[in-house]
Amino acid sequence: MFTFAAFSALLISLAGVVAQTTGTSVDSSILTKTADSTGPSGFSIPALSELTSGAPTDSTVALYSTFAAGATPTVSGAPVLPTSALTIADYPALDVTPPTNSSLVKDWMAKIDLSKVPSYNVTTGDCSTDAAAISDGRCWWTCGGCTRETDIVECPDKNVWGLSYDDGPSPFTPLLIDYLQEKNIKTTFFVVGSRVLSRPEMLQTEYMSGHQISIHTWSHPALTTLTNEEIVAELGWTMKVIKDTLGVTPNTFRPPYGDIDDRVRAIAAQMGLTPVIWTSYTDGSTTVNFDTNDWHISGGTATGASSYETFEKILTEYAPKLDTGFITLEHDIYQQSVDLAVGYILPQVLANGTYQLKSIINCLGKDTSEAYIETSSNQTTTQITAATGSQSTFFQPIVGTATGAEVSAPSEATGSTAAGSAASTTSGSGASASTGAASNTSSSGSGRSATMGGALIALAAVAVGMVYVA
């Protein structure tokens, strides 16, 4: 488990790394920029220079609409909204990994064939102290940006932007929802289970408005630091609270901080979930994550102005070099990030006219109904071959989001302890790996962009990102 003490040590050790990937120094012309949008209902968006960690709290806005129990969704084949309200006592405590000894988690675990899950150790979440996890071929995104062919990391068509927001619903989400509704923009919301339990009506409005809902775990941990049982609990409870709220279950998830490896992938596959990360672009020795850094503003390591400048570089320097579309990382958990989106980023994209804004499921060329297990036309049973021997393989589910088939994964490190044990740790030395069907350097013949996240940027994401505000 990634403790606060461990996070503090990691943050201190990575102070130099963070300084390289985020900052508050920007072109002076950006500091004078004012909002291109007043927001829905004349809501006043602060000047860009005022979007800082010390910004005064905005007044919140109401949802443009709420929906009654039994209302019919726009998603083809979906059931009506559930008629029973959520009972908080029926769910785990907020913002902590759920207990693994509950009957539900035991039932979910019973459906997981652990012989088909690579027995890699849990990681420390820290690349500087976990060399063994880097070198054992597990395809750990956090340390090197490794992805598998079945990870969703881009939109196939050039100039299509897969828009997404993480960590909500929050008190500031209604402003974003209202703006998206006003402009007829669809996005993907990667929601935290604890936030859904706190604000189910916001999730229903997102869903009923045609946005894609996806999973972002129950308490926002770095998944590779968890045991198998804890991963199942984090994903399973989030799947359950979403279905209890909407009547459908997402078939995609985004690992917090992008922290994923083949063990997490294999467990998620057996739960019917396909991972979605964000696009990276590699040009020579430079690797850029399509991360606006809006989540750094609240912590003071970025400002609205510096995040906007990052966004402009993505849009003007890196996206045009791709043969494909792209997926970005943005957030609706913070006031500043929502103000940045509604007042600056989205209005500029609309005014520019170059990029088509779509939810991720739509940017893949699929109907929104393909985003949910119950309504997807692709009900292929997940097939996973045994994760043992020199050529272990796993199959990533393709329910609604088919991008590939069986993917070869290298065998686990010799003598490793099964990650199902809470006491599992790793140690040793080694260099970053590039094996199997992993992608961490360049595009394939299909024109796919490079998917190396970049160890420095990813490390900073794990470090600073642990300051998670509920």
Swiss-Prot record:
GO BP of this protein: cell wall organization; chitin catabolic process; fungal-type cell wall biogenesis; polysaccharide catabolic process; symbiont-mediated evasion of host immune response
Cysteine pairings via disulfide bonds: 155-363
InterPro entries reported for this sequence: Glyco_hydro/deAcase_b/a-brl, NODB_dom, Polysacc_deacetylase_ArnD
Disruption phenotype: Decreases chitosan levels during growth in host tissue. Attenuates virulence in a mouse intranasal infection model; decreases fungal burden in mouse lung. Triple knockout of CDA1, CDA2 and CDA3 results in an absence of cell wall chitosan, melanization of surrounding media, an increase in capsule size, sensitivity to cell wall (sodium dodecyl sulfate), osmotic (NaCl) and heat stress, and avirulence in a mouse intranasal infection model.
Domain of life: Eukaryota
Propiece residues: 445-470
Documented effect of changing residue 220 to A: Abolishes CDA1 protein expression
Record protein name field: Chitin deacetylase 1
Native source organism of the sequence: Cryptococcus neoformans var. grubii serotype A (strain H99 / ATCC 208821 / CBS 10515 / FGSC 9487)
